[in-house]
Amino acid sequence: MMPAKERALRQEVIDTCLRMNALGINQGTSGNASVRVADDPAAGFFITPSAIPYEEIRPEDIVKMELDGSHSDNRRPSSEWRFHLDIMRHRPDCGAIVHTHGMFATTLACLRMEIPAFHYMIAQAGGPTIRCSGYATFGTQELSDTALEALEGRRACLLANHGMIAIGPNLKKALALALEVETLAAMYWRTLQIGKPVILPDDEIERVGAKFGTMGYGAVDKAAGNKGQAA
């Protein structure tokens, strides 16, 4: 019988995916999420299974992966398991990952545009820009490598011609940051329709980050809702 704590964590992965679709920052089976099994950075993680609608996923369907890339569950892990694995390996500060194909973040990613500090909330992502990675085919090691590069010193990035990634100490905060990035992408896109935005200087973003908590995980948790699907 599955321990209650493990079942609850697996269910939290499902609930996170349902919320990201309900919030409109993802659709269909395109996104995915993962969370560390324990606070220990050497621990494995739980990740959404591949190609199952979120509302059909049960705790038993969530896949447990080890940091060596192995998994023993019956289901196949998300097709994007490689970048989840590599982020968990290389970022001990990361406790959870949310990957979405939000409309505005993906629009900018298709233009291969980073999001500059046109608004002070950019500091939530850990620096003066939200970078856009290079392009690589989904599910490949090349995509994982370029995502890691774009996330260096950051907690979120866009994936060229693909979507976005947000990380956090837990699923609640990773999802909140993903929502913040989508909101910023929408505001930036709208600003560009009118004119050229005024970009805040790096030292102002540093000050804002310090006020958030030494560039810490300060994203307001706006994430709520349910229903949706998995990649």
PLM features: residue spans?
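Glycine-rich flexible loops
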Residues: 1-231
